[in-house]
């Protein structure tokens, strides 16, 4: 599975303390850490979700956990910043990607994201966003299981200079 479609590794650091035969997850006393500073990454993280473009991030793998601190990136024209991504228990199956993010954008980008993701199957979201036009500030928490259709999410959406169209003819 190639989720990183392109970009640069600006710097990297790897350390491992333990026996070679225990590498990577075979002995809890082993200690593995890798840190990568990435830039201009195009990330297709899941086939059902829109990709992230021009991503700049610090990625840390510390033993059995991956943490990505997103500095900047874009989904469509929506700017992503102040984002953390965590994948725990890398050595096990049934991975969950936990995402906490803040995105400031226009409702058109939010609508495109919804239409091109599993969120389109949640009628409440469609109804809430259908007639709203303007800028939005999204604080979102997602739990995306990589081998399941169930998605858990929560968060806040703030509207800035937005309007609601009634759909009533003039």
What are these regions (language model features)?
Residues 29-31, 53-54:
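Short "repeat-start/strand-capping" segments in structured domains, especially the N-termini
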Residues 41-99, 120, 135, 160-170:
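Strand-loop-strand
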Residues 1-27, 35-39, 43, 89-152, ...:
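Extended amphipathic, helix-rich lipid-handling scaffolds
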């Amino acid at each position: 599975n190639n989720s990183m479609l392109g970009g640069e590794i600006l710097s990297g650091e790897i350390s491992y303390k333990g026996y070679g035969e225990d590498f990577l997850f075979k002995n809890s006393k082993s200690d593995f850490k890798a840190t990568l500073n990435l830039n201009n990454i195009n990330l297709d993280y899941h086939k059902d979700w829109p990709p992230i473009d021009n991503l700049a991030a610090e990625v840390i793998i510390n033993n059995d956990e991956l943490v990505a601190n997103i500095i900047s990136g874009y989904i469509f024209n929506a700017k992503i910043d102040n984002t953390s991504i965590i994948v725990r228990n890398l050595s096990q199956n049934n991975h969950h990607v936990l995402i906490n993010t803040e995105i400031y954008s226009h409702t058109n980008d939010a609508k495109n994201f919804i239409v091109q993701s599993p969120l389109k199957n949640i009628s409440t979201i469609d109804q809430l966003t259908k007639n709203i036009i303007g800028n939005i500030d999204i604080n979102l928490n997602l739990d995306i299981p990589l081998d399941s259709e169930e998605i858990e999410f929560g968060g806040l959406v703030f509207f800035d200079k937005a309007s609601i169209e009634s759909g009533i003819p003039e």
